[in-house]
């Protein structure tokens, strides 16, 4: 809230002060009242509004003004109706009275000025003065909230540039300018006002490395935008002429919210009195605009797809052809990373997660680059980041990175309501160890801190360390569906698979085998059902998935009716450290690519019953009644044999939510 300095008056000599239009300035009546005074009256020029907070006046003075008692509860404020045309052109007279003293007067000469710092605090996309009752120095959530929003300028408008736009202190062009938030300083003063007064724009020193402010000046791009605040400068003294002026600023974020940064940045304009060169400058007035840096937001499977990413490598030509046909059916753009750029690293899902940032005036897709840094490490920087496509990462030391730091272990639910609490942007899901041990793996705390600090998609920790790779996308997915929730949660289910195989054996299909047409050992339904070792392994897997099932029901507000069990078997193998972990026994159907109503599902190569794969038939019977279309894609040799599936090998850029993140209440 804008604040003016307290004005003190004294009978000995006139007082001179500045009053900012629209701001109630405190006036100290009692501090220098003559000894013996018990009451006072006050008169002022027509352009000055005097407000006395007290009980009823004691009586009328001889001048016709009300007399007020001088008691400790007295509060007097002044407001100017308009800016002064010259210095000291408004006057306030205070008369003091006492039972045994004659009337004594104190004079106050006022200069009214208009001074305001405005930004888009109403979130309409345009900078304008805050409406009455809105304190622009605060930031509030919700549909009735207020406060300005700032984007991290993390895209790269110049394709030839080696870094993000915020990494330099220049405005490249008007497109670069559109990534920034406008802010305007409006002033109206007497012509010689700034001979004795100074305006200073400032940011707290602790926040100076989180923001950069450009001042618009006359001239051609880019020289007409001068850096006035940023990592090297926490304050800027404005040299202004008197009269009426408007000064435009453009503000860019330099850092996302994180464990050590809540995302709030106050920018303050201060008016200083420098009239006496022998004294330090005195603070006369301050106005502050509070900005919040927009969070990075993930998009769930229920959001419309816009672009699919995949790698080309020596073993996936047939897969690419199938994927191209599938994405064409879903009317979705397909971008293929060439082999020379991925260095045989086919795990596109693990390398990055594509989300977005948003302010009222601009929405920007932003890729979050994982710290795994294998063959695809340059792809997010060199091929995804660009004009109107931002980039963010959180670096880790190589020795600190585990498989759970890859982004197949980072998912987000559709919007949910949990025990009355709304999550209109869904909740982030990350995999972790169920309990700590010398061999346990977790997503690094630096990544978890970043995700939690965004505030709008409160993370949920799931148990995934039981898996060979350890990612949540190995046992769950979400698909759009009709109904109240608007989606279904798909969970891998050994129990459902055993039940199905048992029924088929009872019907006389025990000799039907998996992996028909593949160079794999023949495995019949009866072989699988008779293996106690495999049963024990899948009972363990089922217990792990059941644990997550209860967590998901509790943290996402789901019921059993919101969950579909996808038949799936696992087996236990040793990982690189020799620890027993689970991996899919046949291609993991829940690890699917969801493009609207079109599902690209790993072809399971299940037993053929009456000319059709019984696993495919079962999944279709579960999902097609929801209005979904199932396409089974052969990824056996290109992905499944390397511990991944269709979802692991692809990535999707999706349409941002229509819901505005600032309308929610975290």
From Swiss-Prot:
InterPro entries the UniProt entry points to: Cupredoxin, PAD, PAD_C, PAD_central_sf, PAD_N, PAD_N_sf, Prot_Arg_deaminase_cen_dom
Entry annotated with the keyword Metal-binding: yes
EC class (word): hydrolase
GO terms, biological process: chromatin organization; chromatin remodeling; innate immune response; nucleosome assembly; post-translational protein modification; stem cell population maintenance
Residue positions binding substrate: 374
Keyword field: Calcium, Chromatin regulator, Citrullination, Cytoplasm, Hydrolase, Immunity, Innate immunity, Metal-binding, Nucleus, Transcription, Transcription regulation
Binding site for Ca(2+) 5: 351, 369-370
GO cellular component entries: cytoplasm; nucleus; protein-containing complex
Positions annotated to bind Ca(2+) 4: 349, 353, 407, 410-411
Chain positions found as Citrulline: 212, 218, 372, 374, 383
Residues annotated to bind Ca(2+) 1: 153, 155, 165, 176, 179
Active-site feature positions: 350, 471, 473, 648
Tissue distribution of the protein: Epidermis.
MF-aspect GO terms: calcium ion binding; histone arginine deiminase activity; histone H3R17 arginine deiminase activity; histone H3R2 arginine deiminase activity; histone H3R26 arginine deiminase activity; histone H3R8 arginine deiminase activity; identical protein binding; protein-arginine deiminase activity
Family annotation (Gene3D superfamilies): L-arginine/glycine Amidinotransferase, Chain A, Protein-arginine deiminase, central domain, Protein-arginine deiminase, N-terminal domain
Disulfide bonds: none
Necessary cofactors: Ca(2+)
EC code: 3.5.3.15
Record has Metal-binding as a keyword: yes
Reaction it catalyzes: L-arginyl-[protein] + H2O = L-citrullyl-[protein] + NH4(+)
Homology family: Belongs to the protein arginine deiminase family.
Protein name stated in the entry: Protein-arginine deiminase type-4
Species of provenance: Rattus norvegicus (Rat)
